[in-house]
């Protein structure tokens, strides 16, 4: 059986969970961080997470089929990321808390 490396896009890469997740990815043999982003104006934009520079372009997280967006951001950001995931056909894992009933229904 051939092993596939799962490509990960990480919004909120500079946050507490983002840093923890990027560390776990760095120590994994079957995951690779391929995109990282922070909100516009964040002092983390341009800094490196491993070999990846943190971007402020959310669209860069839509890495396509075979990739996964791992989201632990804020509800408003999650909804934007969900649209990006749908359009780019990127799977998404949502760990964001505080979603409204309407947001969860969407």
Stretches with model-predicted labels:
Residues 27-48:
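NAD(P)-binding Rossmann-fold cofactor-contacting core
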Residues 3-8:
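Extreme N-terminal starter segment of soluble prokaryotic enzymes
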Residues 16, 42, 75:
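Conserved Rossmann-like nucleotide-cofactor binding loop
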Residues 32-33, 50-64:
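Short acidic low-complexity segments
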């Amino acid at each position: 059986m051939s092993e596939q490396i799962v490509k990960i896009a990480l919004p909120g890469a500079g946050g507490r969970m983002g840093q923890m997740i990027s560390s776990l990815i760095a120590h994994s043999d079957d995951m690779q961080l391929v995109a990282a982003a922070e909100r516009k104006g964040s002092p983390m934009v341009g800094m490196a997470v491993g070999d990846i520079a943190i971007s402020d372009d959310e669209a860069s997280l839509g890495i396509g089929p075979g990739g996964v967006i791992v989201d632990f951001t804020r509800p408003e950001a999650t909804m934007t990321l969900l649209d990006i995931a749908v359009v780019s056909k990127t799977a998404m894992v949502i760990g964001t808390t505080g979603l409204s009933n309407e947001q969860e229904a969407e």
